[in-house]
Regions:
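Hydrophobic membrane-insertion alpha-helices, especially the h-region
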Residues: 1-5
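Long, hydrophobic alpha-helical segments that serve as membrane-spanning/inserting helices
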Residues: 6-201
Length: 201
């Protein structure tokens, strides 16, 4: 083998190894974004149930019995810096085709999840108007019911996508570990606190 050919092979072998490590690290972080969203699913489901009770009480002319803020899911954006770098460079050309396809599918999924998490967050921002019920008018309640319907649809959609990514688009990686402090932060968010007053017996 000519020295120039040997040098080129060594160079690209090293470059691919470094790029692969960066991509795998980024994938692990992006998978943890999906895990983070699913950790909040019990809080989201409970809040949607509580909001339905609020709407039923309003329709019946009953006191709303609000005790807390509506809150919203915390959003972690998926990173794509390593993938963008690889896409605009030449290292991907030196990886096996199957690996390139697997990596591409994973990052497409992460980008879609990141976008849908942001859209879901906007819907919950709309629902946050319930934090000030005294200034709501009839038209506001109609808008809030529509926002509730959207939030329920987004919940189903985003939870499914997050679970799909964690089972089907891992590129052979596992999510970065979310420490106990992360779980504690979720528990302390308004979304995971009771919305309604506890009935006294």
């Amino acid at each position: 083998m000519a020295p120039s050919k040997l040098w080129s092979d060594l160079h690209w072998r090293h470059a691919v190894r470094m790029q692969r490590e960066a991509l795998h690290e980024e994938i692990q972080g992006d998978l943890s974004t999906a895990s983070y969203r699913l950790l909040q699913e019990p809080c989201i489901s409970r809040r949607l149930n509580e909001l339905m009770i609020v709407f039923e009480r309003h329709k019946a002319g009953q006191p709303l019995g609000l005790a807390g803020a509506v809150g919203s899911p915390a959003v972690l954006g998926a990173a794509a810096g390593a993938w963008e770098t690889a896409s605009h460079g030449e290292t991907l050309d030196h990886m096996p085709l199957d690996e390139r396809l697997e990596l591409g599918a994973a990052f497409v999924g992460f980008a879609k999840l990141s976008d849908e998490l942001q859209q879901e967050s906007h819907v919950w921002d709309d629902l946050g108007r319930l934090d000030h019920p005294d200034i709501l008018e009839a038209a506001d309640w109609s808008d809030l019911r529509a926002a509730y319907a959207r939030a329920a649809r987004w919940d189903t959609r985003v939870a499914f996508l997050a679970q799909w990514i964690l089972t089907k688009q891992t590129a052979g990686q596992k999510p970065a570990v979310l420490g106990p402090d992360v779980v504690d932060v979720i528990r302390e968010r308004p979304l995971c606190k009771p919305l309604l007053q506890t009935e006294r017996r």
